Structures are given as C-alpha cells and as structure tokens.
Amino acid sequence: MSNLTISIFGNKIFLEILNELKLFSNYKAIHYDDLDLCIKDAITYSHLVLFFVTQANKNFFEEFKSKNMPLILIAKSKNLKNLALDELMEKLDMPFSMLELKKTITILIAKCEFKKNSLIQLSDYIIDKNERKIKKDQLELQLSEKEINFLILFSKSKDPIN
C-alpha cells in the first residue's frame, strides 16, 4: 500500500487542510460527497477511508462496515460510543493531532497487509491462515492448524499429491 489513496467522506475542509499541510505527501487524498461512489472506489482501488461521523451521517457506518474495507472513524467520542468496530477499522476521537492520524493510518495499513498476506485463494475457496477458516460465498468452516497446513500444501503443489 505504498501508493495509498485516502478517501475522505463527511468533511471536505479536512482535505484542504491535508493539502495545505502537505504532511501526507506520500498519499493521495480524495474527498467524496457521494457515499456509494466513495465505497465503490474504496473497494475497486483499495482506498483507505476516513469517515467523519456526525449525527446526520451516523447511519452510513453500517454500509461501510458491511464492505469490510480499511476505515478510520473520526468523531467526537459521544458519536463513536455504540459503534462496534471490525478488525480493519480504527477510530479517532476529535480533536486529534496529525501525528496521531498518521500513526493510526500506519497501524491500519499494517493490519490490511497482515490480513491480505493471510488469505490464500484456492479455486472458489478462500483460506484464512490466521483465523484458520476456509470460506466459500457466505459459508465458512473452522479448521485445525493441521488441516490448514494440508490445504496450503495442496494449494502450492503443481502436481497431484499421492
């Protein structure tokens, strides 16, 4: 994720602040007014999303959450209280420092890389080495470590295994 793009939803002024400070010059930042376009681009182009949570847009959180994408929620702590976060989500209470934001972005990038490296595609199945699960569509099966190791061995083998 060295060429990371940060999608900002819910606060256009923050994009202007980032551009003015040039703190995140190694990242590209884009503001979105349209929720669907923000989610579509985040999924298609592997963007990290900064979602500024307000009382008015708090209900959009579930749409972001259902997409399983890297997301940083930024809000006053009262707006973040009852939001259950997934593994690819972080939250920042306002006010926050730019150093704190940069640290949170770095942590989330590391989580995404770790998650991406733990997934193996095997035909129509996805093997998650960390969670020791195999998934197909909406079905998932918990496996033992030995079963996971066998599946990984099979996935790496070019020839049939006797």
Predicted regions and their residues:
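Basic, amphipathic DNA-recognition helix from helix-turn-helix-like DNA-binding domains
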Residues: 63-120
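Acidic, metal-coordinating helix/loop segments flanking the phosphotransfer/catalytic sites
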Residues: 33-47
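Short acidic, hydrophobic short linear motifs in intrinsically disordered regions
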Residues: 161-162
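Extreme N-terminal starter segment of soluble prokaryotic enzymes
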Residues: 2-6
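Short, polar loop motifs at secondary-structure junctions
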Residues: 11-14, 34-36, 53-57, 74-81
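Short, Lys/Arg-enriched segments at the junction into DNA-binding effector domains
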Residues: 107-148, 152-157
